[in-house]
Regions:
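Active-site rim elements
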Residues: 21-23, 128-132, 150-154
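A general structural signal for well-ordered alpha-helical segments in protein cores
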Residues: 32-33, 137-142, 168-169
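A generic structural signal for residues located within well-ordered alpha-helices
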Residues: 28-31, 136, 159, 163
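NAD(P)-dinucleotide binding in Rossmann-like oxidoreductases
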Residues: 53-62, 72-139, 157
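C-terminal helix-rich "cap/oligomerization" subdomain common to oxidoreductases
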Residues: 72, 143-183
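Phosphate/oxyanion-binding loops and surfaces in catalytic or ligand/nucleic-acid-binding neighborhoods
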Residues: 42-43, 98-102, 171-174
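Predominantly a Rossmann-like dinucleotide-binding segment in NAD(P)-dependent oxidoreductases
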Residues: 1-58, 178
């Protein structure tokens, strides 16, 4: 995405270590990062680099982060996020497997399996906030209230949710200490 310096200076918490903790990854790309780990294999190693490229002297946190991860059988996962892009483009996530792939760009999901390609639009029609955030927030909010009213369990438990938090901590630790983190 594109975050200009004013985005950070107009708030007392954005871009600060003690109040925000992180910027490009922890604040902007966290839902995509969470989705990536949820859709793929358990992460076993993390090697990351986080830096401030465009917003030097403006923020204490990162505006760019790249992460190389491996799974239990040597699967490779690469994640990149930045707030230095020239526009607020839709989120992109691609998972390439032995026999097929899934590619998400915004609300469009394209699957390829056995030489057949199918694209589905998962737009909910309800967008909370900016359109490049996607419509996932609308789905989640609606599902939350529906399940709450019905007394149903939520699809993700606290134990499952902590996986992304631990992974996020490993990314920042790897970037800070310039080392591979084993999970």
């Amino acid at each position: 995405w594109n975050r200009n310096p004013e985005y950070y200076t107009e708030s007392d918490w954005r871009g600060t270590l003690d109040k925000e903790g992180g910027s490009a990854l922890e604040n902007q790309a966290i839902h995509t990062f969470d989705l990536m780990q949820w859709l793929t294999v358990p992460i076993k190693t993390v090697e990351a680099s986080c830096s401030t490229k465009r917003h030097k002297g403006v923020i204490e946190t990162e505006d760019t982060c790249d992460v190389f991860m491996t799974g239990p059988n040597g699967e490779r996962l690469v994640f990149f996020c930045t707030n230095c892009y020239v526009k607020n483009a839709p989120v992109e996530l691609e998972i390439v497997c032995e026999n097929g792939s899934i590619r998400m760009v915004g609300n469009l999901v394209t699957t390829e399996l056995d030489g057949k390609t199918e694209t589905k639009d998962f737009s909910s029609g309800t967008v909370f906030g900016k359109d490049y955030w996607g419509s996932g927030h609308g789905f989640l909010i609606e599902d939350y209230y529906t399940r709450l009213a019905a007394g149903e369990r939520f699809p993700v438990s606290g134990e499952e949710a902590i996986v992304s938090t631990r992974l996020l901590h490993a990314v920042y630790s790897s970037a800070k200490n310039h080392e591979v983190i084993r999970l």
